[in-house]
């Protein structure tokens, strides 16, 4: 098996090995991965953190050995907990990992901190929405929740439908706490959106941009549009 590490600020992951293919996710600095397929110009990779797969360009690949790969897994890590940080002549995005303490990083923990979860969520307010994005240059709804949870010490999968399998269901918004996660469904009852509750009537989520909106038992109400944009399915507590 072959291994790699993201040595750039961010690397796009695409659905197919083509420049015009859909962006499905992104690698952040020091993310490690395995190679599962390749052609002349592209590598299909699987991320170590969330097992998400996509194609990256070979020109952006940095090879590492099996021993180095295992070493990165076991090594103590710090995580950028500011919207962005200048490190080693690179602009690193929120959620990127490094191997030394800086003023913009905290130790990557394994125990969930609810306060850190909501504080992290607010740090990314007004970051633009981008389908498949995972950085401050553009982020989608599930990557936003995944990264905030990562900084707060909880490992969530990449997609909203997968995230919905985690946690304990909360019966209603009146029973919800800040830091609970709200999931939203389409007409086919499929989970298509996710956000973080700030209170029983406020939610922060990525839709157009990372924004704060009203929420009630029906769903998210956008005051600018004067209407509901997402239909509430259920609430989970990590």
Where are these regions (language model features)?
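Short aromatic-glycine-enriched beta-strand elements
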Residues: 40-44
């Amino acid at each position: 098996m072959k291994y790699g590490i993201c040595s750039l600020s961010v690397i796009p992951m695409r659905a197919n090995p083509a420049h015009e293919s859909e962006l499905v996710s992104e690698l952040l600095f020091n993310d490690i991965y395995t190679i599962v397929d390749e052609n002349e110009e592209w590598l299909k990779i699987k991320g170590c953190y969330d097992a998400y797969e996509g194609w990256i360009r070979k020109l952006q690949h940095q090879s590492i050995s099996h021993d180095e790969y295992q070493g990165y897994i076991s090594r103590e890590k710090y995580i950028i907990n500011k919207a962005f940080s200048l490190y080693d002549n690179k602009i690193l995005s929120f959620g990127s990992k490094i191997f030394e303490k800086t003023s913009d990083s905290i130790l990557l923990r394994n125990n969930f901190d609810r306060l850190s979860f909501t504080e992290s969520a607010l740090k990314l307010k007004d970051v633009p929405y981008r389908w498949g994005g995972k950085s401050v240059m553009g982020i989608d709804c599930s990557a936003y929740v995944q990264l905030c949870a990562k900084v707060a010490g909880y490992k969530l999968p990449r997609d909203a439908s997968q995230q919905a399998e985690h946690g304990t269901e909360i019966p209603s918004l009146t029973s919800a706490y800040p830091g609970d996660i709200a999931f939203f469904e389409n007409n086919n009852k499929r989970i298509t959106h996710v956000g973080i509750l700030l209170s029983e009537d406020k939610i922060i989520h990525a839709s157009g941009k990372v924004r704060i909106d009203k929420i009630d038992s029906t769903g998210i109400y956008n005051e600018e549009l004067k209407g509901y944009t997402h239909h509430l399915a259920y609430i989970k507590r990590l």
